[in-house]
C-alpha cells in the first residue's frame, strides 16, 4: 500500500506551525514558529500582530516541514487545516495557505477542529481505546469531553467564565510575571506553601461545570489590598495557593466525570497539560483508569496534533470544499 502523507497547518492563535504525518502515526516533522517574544511586551496576544507574523513565516514553515520530513510537494496525499476555534485573522492565514497548496496540487482538504487536535495529540503516545474521557485545558478552553470513537466528540462539562490558562495569565500579569505565566507560576508554586484560602467555585455542586473567575478575583483583591496597605506577600506562597485551588477544581470535576462516564482511558491535553502540578495530582489521584498526556512538545499549539486529528476525518472522507471559512467560535462537537 502506498504511504499517505498529510500536510497539516495550525495558525489559530500565536504559533505558526506546519507538520507532516506519515500514515496514521508517524510524525515526520512539526515545525513551530513562536511569536511569544512579539506579544510578551503587551502581556497577551494581539490579534493583528499574530496575523501579520503568520503571513511572514507560513511559506518558510511549509518548506521546512517538507524538507525535515524528507518529502517533496508531489508526495503529499492530503492537506489538513485548523478552521476554528481561534482568532479569525490568524485562522485565515493558515486556511489560505492550506487551500492554496491543496488546490495547486489537486489534493483533498481536511477541516480540523483545533480542540480535537489537542485531544488527538495523545495518539502520539499510544493508540487510543474508545470510548474515553478527555480533560482539555488551555488558554482559551477548559472542557470535559466524552469521545465515543475517533472523531465523535461530546462536551459534557466546560467553564462558565474564564479558561484555566486565561486565569493563570491574568494572575501572572498582576504579579508582574512574564507572559505567558503558566510555567513560571508552576515553578514558583513548587517553592511555596498553600497558605492562602482561595475559593474553589462549584467544587461541591453536582455538575461538570468549571468556574475560575471567582478565584481570579479573590487573588487580585488579596494582592491589591496588600499593596494598598504596604504589606509584602510571598510570591511563592501566592502561586502555591492559587495553583492548589485550580488543581482542586480540575481534579474534583474530572473525578466526578469519570464516575458518570465509566471509561478505561482519560486523556489530558492542551497547553496547561504541561503543568507539573497537574501531572503530579493526576498520577497520585487518578489510578483506576489509564491517563494519557501528550509529550510536552505537543501540549501547546502545533500542527502535529492537527495531523493526528485529521486521520479520523480522512477515514470518514470528511473533506471540505474551497469555500471552507474560518469559524472563530466553532463548537467542539461541530465538524464541517
From Swiss-Prot:
Required for the formation of a threonylcarbamoyl group on adenosine at position 37 (t(6)A37) in tRNAs that read codons beginning with adenine. Is involved in the transfer of the threonylcarbamoyl moiety of threonylcarbamoyl-AMP (TC-AMP) to the N6 group of A37, together with TsaE and TsaB. TsaD likely plays a direct catalytic role in this reaction. Belongs to the KAE1 / TsaD family. It catalyses: L-threonylcarbamoyladenylate + adenosine(37) in tRNA = N(6)-L-threonylcarbamoyladenosine(37) in tRNA + AMP + H(+). It comes from the Bacteria. Signal peptide: none annotated. GO terms for molecular function: iron ion binding; N(6)-L-threonylcarbamoyladenine synthase activity. GO terms for cellular component: cytoplasm. Substrate binds at residues 136-140, 169, 182, 186, 275. Binds 1 Fe(2+) ion per subunit. The gene is tsaD. This is tRNA N6-adenosine threonylcarbamoyltransferase. It is found in: Cytoplasm. Its cofactor is Fe(2+). Its EC number is 2.3.1.234. One of its GO terms (biological process) is tRNA threonylcarbamoyladenosine modification. Pfam families: TsaD. Keywords: Acyltransferase, Cytoplasm, Iron, Metal-binding, Transferase, tRNA processing. Fe cation binds at residues 114, 118, 301.
